[in-house]
Amino acid sequence: LHLLSRRQRQMCIRDREYMAALLTSVLDNSDKVAEYIAECRDCGIELLPPDVNRSSDGFTVEDGGIRFGLVAIKNIGRGFIQTMMRRREQDGPFRSFQDFCQRMFDCTDMNKRAVENLIRSGAFDSMKVRRSQLIQVFEKVLDSIAESRRKNVEGQLDLFGMAAGEDAPPAETPLPDIPEFTAAERMFMEKETTGLYLSGHPMADYRALARQAGAVPIHTILEDFSAEDGPVRFADGQSITIAGIVTASRTRTTRNNALMALSLIHI
């Protein structure tokens, strides 16, 4: 695991542009993105969530924090993001989810998977709508826009006598009055679409218990081994306790016929 040097760590506190550029340089590597975001949080730099009205393709500095770059969301291409940014610049912010779909519909990279991942990653949260509501209606909204475009191409007139070829927007699709996803469900969605937990961390409720059990933060161990004068607190072969979420695990038999487990733990 790569760690920033102490000089770089000090730099990131006062130079958020440096960290934003560093994150943008590893956009295609979710493990590296997660690593550098952890460094940002250690430095006290806030990670701002993805937002269709504020995010760019890469990570950018905003209000003392770093805004999440949309390229880091799965199934979101640069062409789609650049079109989105042009529409914002030319016609102003997207006013609603349906306004976003209407204005972005003719983008060649616009598809249901891209829209769904924007919803699941929280990129529409600032519009004060629930992710559960958008997940319920997004396909209906896109299908309604497609049907409206088809009718316009065919030259059909609406009740107000719009000329053939004009873009008659479909009626606003009402949002169902349903509960929002739980915090755990939202975090799981974020992890699936970005490789990261953005709105929180599943371990947050267990950190106090982990400390009581004597669990050692992994960054404390790594910092000790990366110190210029060598490890002081820890040593090779030492048994320690850590706490985290097991994301993958497999067992194997050693040459001595002993059973061992290899686990990937997200902390």
What is each residue range found by the language model?
Residues L1-H2:
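Short, well-ordered junction/capping motifs at the entry into regular secondary structure
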